[in-house]
């Protein structure tokens, strides 16, 4: 039996260069208790795909959104109701549509990758980011000299979570949501692949607006790194699933989760 008014949405940011899903966040929207909780799934998490051990971001590469959602659902023991995949151009367009975002860049960023034609140069501190700037900030892993977050992908996920919260705040501000709904719809049609209708999205936006941006929170699935994979912690992951993500009335058990060791 499912809880009423509770939905799970897998949000994926696609890497245009390698065809994989670079960012995966499972979002629970609880319209009854009034909260939104997003959990980042490290892209190097170990998963079994086609009977072989792989990194989870390979699932999109192999079978698109459907296989990615099935893999996440199998691992966490809960259904993925909806999927939203956005490519890099869509991310940039959305940030520009809301007039850019003021964001506290967490560290000095100094990175160049001539192969990807990517240069990332920002000073630590609050600054106004355009769509192109924002994309550079959320893609950053480490500096040219190897310094940076200390834990590349985990540090990057924390920055992405903070940035998404800043975007939600700006998108849901009364001025933006009312005057820019047509802009949002165009961006969704052009750059976003989803099984949500525009009506679904508008309804969800209204529900989140009622909750307020302070009811949006994020964390990362509890994990440990052991080359070449990130391993999800079964006990802590189960607790997190039951606390925030589980759409069922009954708690999930250890048997419901399938986390490769």
Predicted regions span which residues?
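Non-catalytic, solvent-exposed segments at the cell envelope interface
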Residues: 1-261
